[in-house]
């Protein structure tokens, strides 16, 4: 990252021509301290993303890495986060478990709990966006409901997986990474609630599950995707 204010300030320092070693040492120490503080401020600019876990296939475990039999909602949020160490490079991550269910068991009670909590959570200055891990069976219904009831311009992203966490080629880790990228992107502000699956960013009003097997399970057939995530960037 290039900070032209920093470059300008250092160029001014370099114009000084001290005639004694004490002054030269002071300028050197001051410049070093300034650069250290600037580096710290850059590190703090990572977005603060809070992850709410509800269970689903993304947190599922199976008896076989190649089989299709599994139990949803078995992996806790801290394990999901730990499984994707790259998350710490793109955001300051916090997380909490809301429920541990398959999304076929999603209820009005959980929906209302999520809506009330999100409206409170998104008012906090230290929260820049929220990711919700969710089963895919009722993900579109949850997204649509939250899009109507959450009153904030901050990004809210639902994410899931078509393969359990113990699968040989689990899609959950990359989906979670892409969801955090999306929740922390300036392009996502004011877009409403979104679903991120298999690199596609879909609006809650248009997303629907079109396939029960393929990792490209969600589409927005009437409006198309809002965008996509590629190489850790929102496009």
Summary of predicted features, one role per range:
Residues 14, 19-28:
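Bacterial N-terminal signal peptides that target proteins for export
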Residues 44-235:
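Active-site histidine-anchored catalytic micro-motif
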Residues 1-5, 35, 232:
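Short intrinsically disordered, low-complexity coil segments enriched in acidic
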Residues 39-43:
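Boundary at the C-terminal end of the N-terminal hydrophobic targeting segment
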Residues 4, 9-13:
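Short hydrophobic targeting helices and cationic amphipathic motifs
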Residues 1-3, 38, 65, 71:
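Intrinsically disordered, low-complexity segments enriched in small/polar residues
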Residues 28-38:
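Bacterial N-terminal signal peptides
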